[in-house]
Regions:
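Periplasmic-binding protein-like
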Residues: 7-11, 87, 126-132
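Short, solvent-exposed amphipathic alpha-helices that sit
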Residues: 42-46, 87-100
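Solvent-exposed, acidic/flexible segments
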Residues: 13-14, 36-43, 60, 85-89, ...
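Structured C-terminal subdomain patch of bacterial secreted/periplasmic proteins
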Residues: 41-43, 47-48, 123, 127-179
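Bacterial Sec-exported substrate-binding components of ABC uptake systems
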Residues: 57-86, 173-179
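Alpha-helical, coiled-coil/dimerization segments enriched in small aliphatic residues
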Residues: 1, 92-119, 150-160
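Acidic/His-rich segments in extracytoplasmic proteins that coordinate ligands and/or metal ions
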Residues: 1-53, 134-147
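Alpha-helix C-terminal capping/helix-to-coil transition sites in glycosyltransferase folds
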Residues: 3-4, 122-124
């Protein structure tokens, strides 16, 4: 139910949202489908869309400035790992690219085929970046005898709540994988 809501944000993969919007009694309900790809550029684009609907553009610009500052600090910490060869889960691509990793192969979600695993190993990765919520690629790291890390693309793990938390968490996991 959307009773009492003024705005509904959704990612587009929630099958029930269009029907709920259509049948809502609240005819003044604003809805906005957003792209949930966790890259800094996309997150800022989506924040701007939301701010426009909520008439909070000034607050969004202030947040964006803080966010960019924090990202810059995190990238300094990640700079020693820039250019490392990485086999990356599809949903970890935005973070991996932002972190400066050299993505040599992208692993799709779902079951891996023997050919896909062999191809990934042949790329001689320094690291496999998997997604915590749908991990599939540990077998590649084990067989390639390289480092392995799981990252997140939405908050929840270890008290992550904000967009900044996602980047803090993922950055710390990447650094730990090389210790």
């Amino acid at each position: 139910k959307f009773e009492g809501a003024n705005v509904v944000l959704y990612g587009g993969y929630e099958k029930m949202v269009p029907k709920l919007l259509e049948t809502s009694r609240n005819k003044n309900l604003l809805s906005l489908q957003i792209d949930t790809t966790a890259s800094p550029e996309n997150l800022m684009t989506q924040a701007r869309k939301i701010a426009e609907i909520l008439k909070k553009e000034k607050e969004e610009r202030a947040w964006e400035e803080r966010f960019l500052g924090e990202l810059k600090d995190l990238q300094k910490k990640l700079s020693p790992y820039s250019g490392k060869r990485a086999v990356v889960h599809f949903h970890a691509q935005p973070f991996s690219g932002w972190a400066g990793l050299n993505v040599v192969q992208v692993i799709p979600p779902g079951e891996l085929t023997p050919k896909l695993v062999a191809d990934a190993i042949a790329r001689k990765p320094d690291l496999v970046v998997d997604i915590l919520h749908f991990p599939v690629a540990k077998v590649i790291a084990e067989n390639a005898q390289c480092r392995y890390v799981q990252v997140i693309n939405f908050p929840g793990k270890d008290n992550t709540v904000t967009l900044e938390d996602i980047f803090r968490y993922n950055s710390s996991q990447l650094v730990k994988s090389f210790e």
